[in-house]
Amino acid sequence: MIWSSDSCFKSRKHQCLIFLKLCSSIKHLLQIHGQIHLSSLQNDSFIISELVRVSSLSLAKDLAFARTLLLHSSDSTPSTWNMLSRGYSSSDSPVESIWVYSEMKRRGIKPNKLTFPFLLKACASFLGLTAGRQIQVEVLKHGFDFDVYVGNNLIHLYGTCKKTSDARKVFDEMTERNVVSWNSIMTALVENGKLNLVFECFCEMIGKRFCPDETTMVVLLSACGGNLSLGKLVHSQVMVRELELNCRLGTALVDMYAKSGGLEYARLVFERMVDKNVWTWSAMIVGLAQYGFAEEALQLFSKMMKESSVRPNYVTFLGVLCACSHTGLVDDGYKYFHEMEKIHKIKPMMIHYGAMVDILGRAGRLNEAYDFIKKMPFEPDAVVWRTLLSACSIHHDEDDEGIGEKVKKRLIELEPKRSGNLVIVANRFAEARMWAEAAEVRRVMKETKMKKIAGESCLELGGSFHRFFSGYDPRSEYVSIYELLDLFKFQLTCDYRLVSE
């Protein structure tokens, strides 16, 4: 880095500020810092503020350096401390934002309205509910409880920490709201499984004359929960409002259609998208694999590798392994599994090991699947064992070495109170005509008051999902169930048409 001694420069301070604006690496930042000391500018508040900004928020990010600067300075400007707090809030150590605020209080630096949004964002990042509640007390103390940005971040915090009632309370008490406020509360509802309330909230938003944006639609699409009719309705809103089909919105549409079984629509959106990222490709590949279009999924993966600059991630490989499972491609499954780490530097996760067990289990290679589990680099979870036990039930004639028995014992050791495990074991005994053993398992379940999770049936009618569970008390639900079935029968009758050849 070349420093000019030309007298045309108004001052060394001006020169330092120019280089700080151009700084793009820690190496350059340290050089500039050295020149600042040589120029005796190390106590200049504006220079310190710029140094903190660059080391907290730019490409030359070094939060430890920014922290040291502030600790050795007498800067009492809240905006400078806010920059360090903001840097920590989006770092791997968001809890350090709390230290920044504590240091501000110790020095008697009064916070401003930008102080608390960064602190609340940090609390959401490390799921610091207690810390977040303490920050909310500080918000009230300093009179920022009516600030819209503070409110939005409080909603985000409580939603992330699964406190939807608190999130809704903050939202309801806001005197000023913007689109982000509505998006925040709807996101909180989606993340906590309250999908029906999301669309009620959206209707309320429209009723209050707020204009939904791209984020609103992405949130609504994630709330469709496999409801194709509802997904189409949201898509129509995207088109009516003439929102740009960018990568983020397009990916949300592809993901929704793929999860809802509307693969033709997913393909149409996918093909029309100009910009696709790894999540777009992965959503399409996973959707195809899960709905039986395994060969097409593998072809699409091959196309992604050859014709685009996009590199696969862990979700992409999950879709690829799922496709191999559905087509019985055991050798290809092994190949892709090993390529993950060797070529693409993606360390296989539990879910990938489970997918390989599924591939081997479906192919009837029970011993191989069992050995594969025993060689895993970490302790397999119950899902992996259940996958193998399911395969043992299907291929019980080929289980010469009693793999099913070993898996059964291990599964009960891992989850002794999970009723589903004992149900699987009882069914396995029944399939093998071991009636006494099956009865014994059922007896244990009954004595320990262990109940099987009720089976659930879903019916989509008029854009709404209606759920029915086995074991309903007919005295309470009988009438409404049969009224709905009569309505369904009527709709089928109305839609029925004879086709003449």
UniProtKB/Swiss-Prot annotation:
UniProt keyword list: Repeat
Q: Where are the PPR repeats?
A: 77-111, 112-146, 147-177, 178-212, 213-243, 246-276, 277-312, 313-343, 349-379
Keyword field contains Repeat: yes
Positions of the UniProt region annotated as Type E motif: 384-462
GO BP term (any one): RNA modification
Which positions make up the signal peptide? none
Q: Which InterPro entries match?
A: E_motif, Pentatricopeptide_rpt, PPR_At4g14850-like_plant, TPR-like_helical_dom_sf
Per the record, which residues fall in region Type E(+) motif? 463-493
PANTHER family with a match to the protein in the record: PENTATRICOPEPTIDE REPEAT-CONTAINING PROTEIN (PTHR47926:SF347)
Protein name in the entry: Pentatricopeptide repeat-containing protein At2g36730
Native source organism of the sequence: Arabidopsis thaliana (Mouse-ear cress)
